[in-house]
């Protein structure tokens, strides 16, 4: 598929901020520990751990830090009470939002998440209220490249779809459990991805205008500032014209 705006991404990421780097590392370490505790320390047989390792490396975490986190999870530690919680809700402009958390205190987490929705004109929904609009997928991203070559190699490696954006970027979609294998197969063909992650891909989009777009971005920022929030997914789409006004 072609003609998509990169603003259609399900997750908005601002330029890296040094002030948030420590918090990002803390969240990644928490996910590494939990993934290893639940599924074991072998990334080859633990897709969740493999995805966490990919994210850690993409954020320039050292192998030493990464391996220590995995060892903590395998050995058991005080993170044993952590559980994955998914909150669903509606953001500005009717945007469907899913918030993935790792928490040892549901009451604290839901209060922080609800506050973010309320402050930006949204509302926290019930389980299942928006989940049906999303599918869990692996996303392998190239900032640029030969579309035909990547598409041919990706489909041969077992990818489900390839999307080209207006700015020349290319995303390869896979079953989430197969993301690592497809990425490695592409690398073996000389096609090194710029990023690979597990994401929730929406089946429909909600167009944001000049009024709702900044509110949506504020909601995402508020949620990501919560210590317990690991990922924020949404179906908001901001056109290039609206983006230019932000």
From Swiss-Prot:
Keyword field contains Cell membrane: no
Tell me one GO molecular function of this protein.
Answer: DNA binding
- Pfam families membership: TACO1_YebC_N, Transcrip_reg
InterPro entries hit by this protein: Integrase-like_N, TACO1_YebC-like_2nd/3rd_dom, TACO1_YebC_N, Transcrip_reg_TACO1-like, Transcrip_reg_TACO1-like_dom3, YebC-like
Highest taxon in the source lineage: Bacteria
Biological processes annotated in GO: regulation of DNA-templated transcription
Q: Does the keyword Transcription apply?
A: yes
The main location class comes to cytoplasm
Which cellular components does GO assign to this protein? cytosol
Alphabetically sorted, this entry's keywords are:
Cytoplasm, DNA-binding, Transcription, Transcription regulation
Q: Where in the cell is it found?
A: Cytoplasm
UniProt family annotation: Belongs to the TACO1 family.
User: What is the name listed in the Swiss-Prot or TrEMBL entry for this protein?
Assistant: Probable transcriptional regulatory protein Ent638_2432
| Species assigned in the record | Enterobacter sp. (strain 638)
């Amino acid at each position: 598929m072609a003609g998509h705006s990169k603003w259609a991404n399900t997750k908005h990421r601002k330029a890296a901020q040094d002030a948030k780097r420590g918090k990002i590392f803390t969240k990644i370490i928490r996910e590494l520990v939990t993934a290893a505790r639940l599924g074991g320390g072998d990334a080859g047989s633990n897709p969740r751990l493999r995805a966490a390792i990919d994210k850690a490396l993409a954020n320039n975490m050292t192998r030493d830090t990464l391996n220590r986190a995995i060892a903590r999870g395998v050995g058991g530690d005080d993170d044993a009470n952590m559980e994955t919680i998914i909150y669903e809700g509606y953001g500005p402009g009717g945007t469907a939002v899913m918030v993935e958390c790792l928490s040892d205190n549901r009451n604290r987490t839901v209060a922080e998440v609800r506050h973010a929705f309320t402050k930006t004109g949204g509302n926290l929904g019930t389980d299942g209220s928006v989940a049906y609009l999303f599918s869990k997928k692996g996303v392998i991203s190239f900032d640029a490249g030969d579309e035909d070559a990547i598409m041919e190699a990706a489909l041969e490696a077992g990818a489900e779809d390839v999307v080209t954006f207006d700015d020349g970027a290319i995303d390869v979609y896979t079953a989430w459990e197969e993301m690592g294998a497809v990425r490695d197969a592409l690398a073996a063909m000389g096609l090194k991805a710029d990023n690979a992650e597990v994401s929730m891909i929406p089946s429909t989009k909600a167009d944001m205008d000049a009024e709702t777009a900044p509110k949506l971005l504020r909601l995402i920022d508020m949620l990501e500032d919560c210590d317990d929030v690991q990922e924020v997914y949404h179906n908001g789409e901001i056109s290039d014209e609206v983006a230019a006004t932000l």
